[in-house]
């Protein structure tokens, strides 16, 4: 009996030692991973504060990615390019289609019919609401970028709002620019956005704003994203640059 008890105790101690060794190894790996991630964050922050183009692009990509919109109908897809020479950020942003606006203005219960009936929106209301959405996203995006510019890396930003849809006349896929604005940061930050008429505000900034975005009436972008010169660093270039940095 004593021998079996002693053997059981030895087995328990061996199991405990193995469990502790496994725990210590996992703890060490976790601490190393935390240290590595913290070092990466510190390195990224240092690069961003130094206005390194790759870091500026990656930072602003994170700013826009964290912007919250409804999940239905709002693509939240975008492309970014940055010129360190002019401190200009160019954003090509995918806007929701007009179908994102519900066709029904309201629902009401009709007691005599014991049914719920809907009231359709008027076409003029849909037009106004959609134009307001386009202008709101444009101003909001510029505001978020400039407000988040902790490194003071941006002197101005260009926003091109695009609609990816199908041409109702041909059925072909089309990509239509419906708003384009180039805004100096200091001028923009002086605006009282809560007081402005959004479309009038954009036009005062020199924006090209479609009168009928609901009908895919296009505008000419102030800067064509695909035509930016080699001084601009784009998202793919920025990621490659950050990954190639020495550890």
Where would I find each of the regions flagged by the language model?
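Long, charge-dense low-complexity segments
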Residues: 1-247
């Amino acid at each position: 009996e004593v021998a079996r008890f002693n053997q059981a105790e030895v087995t328990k101690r061996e199991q405990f030692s193995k469990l502790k060794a496994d725990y210590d190894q996992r703890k060490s790996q976790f601490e190393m991973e935390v240290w590595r991630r913290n070092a990466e964050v510190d390195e990224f922050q240092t690069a961003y504060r130094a206005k390194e183009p790759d870091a500026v692009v990656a930072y602003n990509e994170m700013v826009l990615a964290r912007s919250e919109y409804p999940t239905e109908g709002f693509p939240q897809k975008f492309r970014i390019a940055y010129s360190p020479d002019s401190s200009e950020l160019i954003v090509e942003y995918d806007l929701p289609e007009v179908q994102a606006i519900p066709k029904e203005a309201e629902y009401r219960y009709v007691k005599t019919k014991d049914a719920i009936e809907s009231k359709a929106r008027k076409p003029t209301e849909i037009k106004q609401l959609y134009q307001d959405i386009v202008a709101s996203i444009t101003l909001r995006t510029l505001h978020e970028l400039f407000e988040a510019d902790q490194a003071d890396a941006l002197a101005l930003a260009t926003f091109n709002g695009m609609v990816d849809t199908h041409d109702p006349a041909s059925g072909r896929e089309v990509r239509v620019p419906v708003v384009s604005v180039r805004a100096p940061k200091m001028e923009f930050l002086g605006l009282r956005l809560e007081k402005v008429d959004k479309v009038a505000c954009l036009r005062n900034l020199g924006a090209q704003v479609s009168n009928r975005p609901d009908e895919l009436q296009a505008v000419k972008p102030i800067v064509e994203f695909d035509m930016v010169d080699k001084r601009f660093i784009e998202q793919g270039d920025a990621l490659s640059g950050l990954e190639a940095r020495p550890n």
